[in-house]
Amino acid sequence: MPSLKDIRNRITSVKKTQKTTSAMKMVSAAKLRRAEIASKAANPYSAQLKRVVSSLSSRFGEDDNPLFREPTSNRTGVILLTSDRGLCGGFNTNLCRTVLRQLTESGVSDAQFVTVGRKGNDFIKRSSHTIIKHYGDTPPGERPRVINEVVGLMMERFVAGELDRVLLVYSHFVRVLTQQPTIETLFPIEPPEAEETDEREVLFEPSPEQILGALLQKYVQNCVFTAWLDILAGEHAARMTSMEAATKNAGEMIDKLQLYYNRSRQAAITTELIEIISGSESL
């Protein structure tokens, strides 16, 4: 049976942990708000770029651009976006398990991974797949450079025929309590569907071929960028939820320990009183 001192020390320890988890929850909430603002700010550009690419790509076929080439085998590249830090529940684990299960069902045993985020890299290292490039702890100012490098690397391998398809894997941020593991095909590029029909004839200068060639890489880079924004928002939402649950659990544990302490102290006092009374009666 633990002593009263041991119980007091345990209560103090849990209270310190509760303060830490509560602070982490507030920090994650603030970061989540900033991530949501950044995601909303990127939406107009993404929508307009999607509209232009949709209009242009409808004019061309597979033979007009190698990025439209249909796969002839199952050689697969994967861009995996995860967080660098943990303490966010099953946020990263669920995503990694989803992509590995999907690859297994597709008969892919040795995909080429580019991992962005330490958690995904650590997970894939334990699998049969190959990591050809890893980016971890990327500061905000370096994200555009990393995106350009990742897209350029995978595009080069796809055009050279080393890969037949390239997948983008991330957790789509739906709401605070919902992050949906998502697998999208980056290459071959699947032209986005037009959101609305515009019957007006559009004049392009220079030629539509040149404009489409310049925009396709920008379009893919933007897909990766918006997915990264989703990952950031989802990470902070998952961590905020996890820390809220941890703070609540710590509070419940403190209440139980305090009750146990009070009962133990009362029992100790009662025992001492009985001993005193018994001693006085013997005199």
Label the model's feature ranges:
Residues M1-L283:
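C-terminal beta-strand-loop-alpha-helix "lid" module of Rossmann-like NAD(P)-dependent dehydrogenases
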